[in-house]
Amino acid sequence: MDINRWSLQGMTALVTGGSKGIGYAIVEELVGFGARVHICDIDETLLNECLSGWHAKGFEVSGSICDVSSRPQRVQLMQTVSSLFGAKLNILINNVGKYILKPTLESTAEDFSSLMATNLESAYYISQLAHPLLKASGNGNIVFISSVTGVVSGTSTIYGVTKGALNQLARDLACEWASDNIRANSVAPWVTATSLVQKYLEDEIFAEAMFSRTPLGRACEPREVASLVTFLCLPAASYITGQTICIDGGFTVNGFSYKP
């Protein structure tokens, strides 16, 4: 067996929003497979706490403050990444996202602008800025962290629109940038047990509504998302591009009221 197919040794990665939840798990998984990782986050205190913890473990992780919804800060971020990694980048994980759970008639123009800027605009322009670095690496990979609500209807139209757009962006970039040896895929998790979601998981009514139609009958764990994301970046996944892969415990394929 060629073990290099299952290694990220010598590769570089940028993970946006890497200091908590799914992003944090992705960082640890990428490092575990040998990658050098740079993260960005808007929370300086949390970022520094994570970096201290990782450095204590001997992980090669660096970080910088960035509000990805800000164009100047996105440009500065990519300049930093270029300087750190010798103008080359193998892996870009567009992980940053937020949600505002409102139905259409209750959503405001401010809600729309905020979600579009953070969830979609940031991923679009960071990918654009990263293109020269990804191309220069000779083996570029982009993974968008989407959501099941970008595949099937959910409880927030704006949030779902941003995530559905990420899925389409993965398809478009997969075709447009294939000649530059850049792959692009989207990972669409179902409800994931992060600190932000934990309060909802403790609500029995919410949990019943979410998991009564989920064959595996539970929330996804951040490390489970991280495993899929990392696999897509491995040489072993070199023929996978333009895909949206749901990691949802069977939720999107359950066509009847299944009770786990």
From Swiss-Prot:
Parts forming coiled coils: none
E.C. number: 1.1.1.-
GO MF assignments: oxidoreductase activity
Domain of life: Eukaryota
Cross-referenced Pfam families: adh_short_C2
Presence of keyword Oxidoreductase: yes
Binding-site positions, NADP(+): 14-38
Cellular component annotations (GO), alphabetically ordered: extracellular region
NADP among keywords: yes
Active site (UniProt): 159 (proton acceptor)
Positions of substrate binding: 147
This protein's UniProt keywords: NADP, Oxidoreductase
InterPro entries in the record: NAD(P)-bd_dom_sf (IPR036291), Sc_DH/Rdtase_CS (IPR020904), SDR_fam (IPR002347), TR (IPR045000)
Homology family: Belongs to the short-chain dehydrogenases/reductases (SDR) family. SDR65C subfamily.
Protein known as: Tropinone reductase homolog At1g07450
